[in-house]
Amino acid sequence: MIGQLSASVPVFSGFKIHNSIAVQENLYQAEMATTSQTKDEIALRVIDYYTRLYKAQKRIELLKENQKSAQQRVKDFIELEKNGIIPRNDLLKSQLQVSKIQLNLDEINTNLKIINFYLVTLLKLNPETKLEIRESDFADFEITTIPTNDHLAIENRKDLEALRFQGKASEANIKIAKGFYYPTIAIIGGYTALDLSNVITVQNAMNIGVGISYDLSTILKNGTTVKLAENKFVEVQNSEAMLMDYIKIQVQKSIEDYDLSLKQNVVFSEALEQSAENYRIIKDKYDNGLSDTNDLLEADVEQLSSKINNALTKANTFQKYYELLSATGQLSQTFTISKN
C-alpha cells in the first residue's frame, strides 16, 4: 500500500497575480465610471426633451392667441370689403395669414406629439401619458455655480475617468506580460506513507523545498505579447488625449452658448416692448388710413415673433445652463437620478 500527497504554493510568479488583481480592479472602476457617464447622458437627454416640449407647448399657446386675433381681423375685413372700404386683395392677405398660422400650428402639434412620445418612453411612462410642462420650472430655477473654464471638467468627467482607469489596467497588463520573463518560484511539500508487506514500511515521510521553473517557449514568444500590451496602452493614452481636447472645446462652446443666452434674454425683452409699441403705432396709422395692410400684417408677425422669443428665452437659458454642467461633469451633482 502506498499513499502520497504533494502541494505547491507559489511565492513568486513575476508579479502576475498582483498585477492581474490590479487589472480587474481598474476595469471595474472604469465600468463604474462609464455607467455614471451614461446616467449623465440620459439626464441631459431628458432635460433636452423637457425643454423642447415646453417650447412647443408655449409656441402653440401664443400661436392660438394670435390665431384668434387674425380670425377676428378676417371677419372685420370681410365686412369692410363688402362695403367697399378695402380692396379684396387686403382681405385675401388677412386670410392667407390665418392659413399660415394654422400650418404652423399643425406642424408644431406634430412635433409636440413626437417629443412627448420620446420623453415618456425615456422615462418609462405609459405611452399614452400627456406631459404638461410648468412655466414656473423655468422662471424659478436657481443657478448655483457657473463654470468659467475646463478645470472642473478635467477633474469630474466620468468618460475621462473611465479612460484613465483603462490606462491603469493597460499598464498592469504590460507588467503581466513582462512577468513571463521571470521564473516561477514555489514552496513544494510532500507526504508519503509506504507499506510493502515483508519488504519496507515508511510512515509519515515528509519533504519540503523550493522549486524554480522556467517556460523557455513562452519566453521566446513573449515579445509579441508585450508589444501588443504596450500598443494597447498607447492606444488608450491617445484616446485620453483626444477626449481631453474634445472636452476643452465642448466646455468652451457651452460657456459661450450660455453667455449668449443671457444676452438674448435682455435683447428679447427689449424687442418685445419695441414690437408691441410698433404694432400699436402701425395699427393706429392703419385705422387712420396712413398705412396699408402689408404694414399691419408685418407688424403683427413681428410682435408674435417677439412674444415667442421672449417666452422661450428662459427655457433656452435653462437648457444651456445644464448643458454647461454636463460638459464640466457636474450634472450628476445637481440632482439625483432614481428609478423606482
Model segments located where?
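Long amphipathic alpha-helical coiled-coil segments
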Residues: 118-126, 323-334
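Transmembrane beta-barrel architecture of outer-membrane proteins
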Residues: 2, 48, 93, 184, ...
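Amphipathic alpha-helical coiled-coil scaffold segments and their short linker/junction regions
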Residues: 125-190, 334-340
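Hydrophobic, lipid-facing positions within transmembrane beta-strands of outer-membrane proteins
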Residues: 1-7, 149, 206-212, 254
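Amphipathic alpha-helical coiled-coil segments
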Residues: 38, 42-61, 79, 115, ...
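Periplasmic alpha-helical coiled-coil/stalk elements that build and connect Gram-negative outer-membrane
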Residues: 41-154, 254-257, 261, 303, ...
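Small/polar (Gly/Ser/Thr/Ala-rich) solvent-exposed segments
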Residues: 8-37, 161, 180-206, 213-227, ...
